[in-house]
């Protein structure tokens, strides 16, 4: 696994974790991608995930945002276990998202489907969303 490194930019005494991963494990096609990963991200911290290609850095972000669901473990955001939250609910309620390093669209969707997917994250009211796309 890559190295998880935290950089503190300000000191906030007594702050609770904003994002907490507990014992996250993920396997895919008999390959263990993440194995028992746990860490807290507190207010005022910046988190850097360092490591070579293929060790699971992007996978961790995909799990936090709800794009992937781990086989085991908990994801706590603002003291709520969000493991079963849909992507749209997680994104809108907690104002959390992820922009991948290689483009920000889904290759297997049409342009309109991509816009609707982003719209679902940003605009909960379907009538308003559809009128804008």
Identify the function of each model-found stretch.
Residues 65:
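Helix-to-loop junction immediately C-terminal to a conserved catalytic motif
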């Amino acid at each position: 696994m890559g190295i998880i490194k935290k950089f503190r930019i300000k000191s906030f005494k007594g702050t609770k974790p904003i994002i907490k991963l507990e014992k996250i494990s993920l396997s895919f096609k008999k390959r263990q991608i993440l194995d028992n990963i746990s860490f807290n991200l507190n207010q005022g911290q910046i988190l850097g995930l360092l490591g070579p290609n293929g060790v699971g850095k992007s996978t961790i972000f995909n799990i936090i945002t709800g794009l992937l669901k781990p086989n085991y473990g908990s994801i706590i955001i603002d003291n709520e276990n969000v493991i079963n939250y849909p992507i749209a609910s997680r994104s809108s309620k907690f104002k959390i998202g992820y922009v991948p390093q290689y483009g920000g669209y889904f290759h297997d969707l049409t342009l309109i489907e991509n816009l609707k997917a982003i719209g679902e994250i940003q605009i909960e009211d379907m009538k308003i969303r559809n009128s804008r796309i």
